[in-house]
Structures are given as structure tokens and as C-alpha cells.
Amino acid sequence: MVSTIHCDSLWYGADIVTMRGGKYHLIPQGAMAVTDGKIVWIGPYNELPRLSASREVIYSSGLITPGLIDCHTHLVFGGDRSAEFEQRLNGVSYAEIAANGGGIVSTVRATRNASEQQLLEQALFRLKPLLAEGVTCIEIKSGYGLSLESEIKMLRVARQLGELLPVTVKTTCLAAHALPPEFSGRADDYIDFVCDTIIPQVAKEKLADAVDAFCEHLAFSLAQVERVFLAAQQAGLPVKLHAEQLSSLHGSTLAAKFNAMSADHLEYATESDVRAMADAGTVAVLLPGAYYLLRETQCPPIELFRQYNVPMALASDANPGTSPALSLRLMLNMACTLFRMTPEEALAGVTCHAAQALGLQETQGTLETGKLANWVHWPLSHPAELAYWLGGQLPASVVFQGDARP
């Protein structure tokens, strides 16, 4: 006698794009059974086992993809730098803007001056458009406080976002983002402060899931970043790195040495960097929004990532200076158009590979038995349309941990 499987809910009637192994692996007319917020069965509807579901949801058509994951953002910050955008378009250089108190220094000042509640309200305003596009998991960095009090304030706000809205929030301590004004000309002293004070306190309060740094001529050196990584290691936190965005310092090789979850930007990564990332299992997080806004001309080495089987993730890099992007779907099109990624690679970049960049590959990023029941139902007929359309085509519905998101 065939036993009956009991589940909380059964969902069927749409084609399911599972993204197993980074490929579409489409199930026509698929079905998913969910219990306790996890998928307990997935497959073609006509192969359903005997099920008893407390609730059934029938999709009349369309596509289901895994919930989208934005694995690199700077959503929490104070102030507004839209005026700088106009200035740059009128020929004012970034150096001139910075000399007049603008640039990242203005964001640091505004973030320090803002209350926790003000930062929370502003971040909610930025997060909601991403959720409307089907984002079910997001990473949020600190890095605009650059003091113990303000870095902790930013991370607390990021944690609150995950408590207030139906979305998984992973937080990253990016205190080694820029040099605060009070440490002008004393970068090593600031790195001492980050390593000896900020990272240990953030770890003690369990406010961060990872530690990041910015390795670049205008930020921090390889030696300074290595000290940050050692402090993170001592605190029991994994690392990731902004690397090779504007020049080749081989920061991604250093990141790989520390088994970083990801190295991000990577426009100037070399073959040796890519090989090191492949050996370490470090994900390449590509950020076409920043590439676009900065009018960069050097693309990340996509062919090398393919050759060495380095997983490529995509993210919005939502931030006030170089990527004021509140659309992860737009990044799919940009990655295909600017970086020549395929639509399938792009979708993998905001699902399974983005999950890997956050260390969440065991629970999110694909639609498989045992994974969280996070998915998006789209009024589309082919998954390539997600990268093809510029704007529009919002999800018909989003499911987060087995429940339809309001």
C-alpha cells in the first residue's frame, strides 16, 4: 500500500526553473510540496506522489524561479548625493567634489549624524523596490560609519530590516572601506583600530556574518587588508573583498588565500587571480551597475571565469556614490549587454551563485528538496525574458519560506 505524504501546501501549474548546477533545468508544469517553509517534493505535476496538502495553490501559467538574492549592497547610509551626479555630468571631477566636502566623506558625515531610526526609514525606502522585484535574500554592508559607534549603528539597522520585512538579511562589516577624516594620513593607525576594536566588538555583539574590505590604491593596501582578514579570522568571521575594481593589486589572490566567500568587482583581475579563486572556491561577484555609472571600459575577465569554472554572481551594489541601483533585474540585462554573460549565467548570478557568495548554498539559491521554499512567480514564458526586458514585468507573486509575501 502506497503511503500518503502530508504537507502544509502544494503549488503547481507553472513551469519551474530550478537553477540546479547553475542551469535552468526547467520542469514543465511542475509542482512543489512544502512543509515548515521547506520544499519536501518537487517534480512534474503528472509524477506527483500521493499527497495530502492543507492548502493548494494553482498557477494558471508562467514561470517560477528561485527567489532572487542580492549578494552585495550598501543600502544603509545617510544623506543624498544626487547633486554630485549632476556635478559629474557637468564636468566636475570626483577629486574636486571630494575637496569640497563631497564624495564618500559627505556620506560618512550624514551617516554619523543620522539616528538609528532615520537610517532605518531611509533603508526601508531603498529595500522595498528590491523586494518588489522578487528579492528574498539580501546582503547589506556597513562602511559609512567608520567609527565604532556608527559602524555598529549601521549593522543594527541592517539586522532590523530582516526583522521587519519578509527577507533574509546577511550583514557584513566593511569598516575598512575608506579612511575617516579624523585618521587622515594615518591609514595604518585606522587599520589598528578596525582590527583591535571594531571587528572584535562587532563579533561580540553578533552583528556581522562576514568581514569585507576595499583593496585599492585609493583605499587600503594588500598588507593592510591582510591584517583585517587576520582579525576577522581570529573573530571567527568569514571574509570577502572589494578587489581589482580600478587597478590590479591582486587583492582577489589574497582573498583566495583566506578562502574568501567572494571577491567583488574584478574588472582588473588577472589569470593568476582567477586561478587562485578557482582553487579556493571563491565566488566572483560582478557589479555591472558600478561599471556602467563610472563609464568603465575594462570588463571583468568573463572568459577566464568560465575557463576556470569560477562561479559568477551578480549584485546591485546599491550605494550612494557609484551604483544608486534599486533594481537587481536591471543588473541581469547589464551583465548580458555589457559583460556578454548569457541570460542563464545572469540568472544563476542572482540565484545559486549569489547564495554561494553568502555561504547559503545549502539552503537557498535553487529549487530542490530540502531547500527553503523561496521563489518568484513571473508572468513570462521563457527565463531569458528576465534578462531581456528593461524594467517592467514585476513578479506575479513572491513566496518566502512557504508563504505568499504580501
UniProtKB/Swiss-Prot annotation:
CDD domains: Imidazolone-5PH. 4-imidazolone-5-propanoate binds at residues 81, 144, 177, 245, 322. Binds 1 zinc or iron ion per subunit. InterPro entries: Amidohydro-rel, HutI, Metal-dep_hydrolase_composite, Metal_Hydrolase. Its EC number is 3.5.2.7. Keywords: Cytoplasm, Histidine metabolism, Hydrolase, Iron, Metal-binding, Zinc. This is Imidazolonepropionase. It comes from Yersinia enterocolitica serotype O:8 / biotype 1B (strain NCTC 13174 / 8081). The gene is hutI.
